Amino acid sequence: LSLPQNFSLDNFAEAMRVTDFWHSLGNSIIITAATIILSLVIHSMAGYAIGRNMSRKKGFKLVYFYIVSGMFVPFAILMMPLVKQTANLGLDNMAGVIILYTVFYMPMNVMLYSGYMKNVPMAMEEAADMDGASAWRTYWTIIFPMMKPMHATVAVLTALGTWNDVMTPLVIMSGSDNITLPLAQLNFQTQFG
């Protein structure tokens, strides 16, 4: 083994050309950013509602366990029915993958948000209620900003899972225009060994 005779970046340029690197990178960024935004909004609202009401109302505990039980279902079991359903609904594109990721990460994120909400005191919400704020305004102006540490945790976990996933875009999206960066790297798995 020795160093190469001539230093060259041609291999990197060829790799970027073969994978359509910039287009794949853009697709990955769009899918990841949209999934994070939808997850933060939808999952935080669900976690807030469940976390605040689980100890007081029996129905919320059942909903919580129903949602969290989704963590025990592996993707391999859901893969073939999802391919058929997304194709029938016309969601075999980036929008379909974003929706699926948002649903896939819901059990974990709702569990995190509801656990966080159990430890947040009710005093701020009660004060907003006394001032005449609606539940919607209380959530967006008081509760949502108070959940910043959990937003950061959910954003990082969702981003890592979305960015590194190969299987979901591979089986859901059709056409080479929609490939993500991890999916584009599959070209090299069989091409060079």
Annotate the PLM regions.
Residues 1-193:
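A structural signal for multi-pass alpha-helical bundles of membrane permease subunits
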